[in-house]
């Protein structure tokens, strides 16, 4: 799987957070083994923890956004949304 690029505003990407992100995004391998790039952008304010991810697979760009009051919960929601979209792009065997 492609390395994960992480950037953000108002957040420090700690080793613990990075490990959590790597673990959660590792789930994507089961749904798409041809991911060419992953970029995650975090935006943290007093009230919200928001994240947006852009994933590139051959022929498609998949984008998802999530937000909650907890960054770890936001990442969980984001990964679930991406998996749902990746499953839509899986080749069908008829």
What are these regions (language model features)?
Residues 1-94:
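N-terminal, polar/charged subdomain of small-to-medium soluble alpha/beta proteins
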């Amino acid at each position: 799987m492609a390395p994960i690029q992480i950037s953000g505003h108002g957040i420090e990407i700690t080793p613990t957070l990075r490990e959590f992100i790597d673990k959660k995004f590792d789930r994507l391998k089961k749904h798409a083994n041809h991911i060419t790039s992953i970029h995650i952008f975090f935006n943290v304010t007093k009230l919200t923890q928001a994240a947006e991810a852009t994933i590139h697979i051959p022929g498609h760009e998949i984008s998802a956004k999530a937000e909650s009051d907890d960054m770890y919960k936001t990442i969980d929601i984001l990964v679930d949304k991406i998996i749902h979209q990746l499953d839509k792009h899986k080749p069908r065997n008829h």
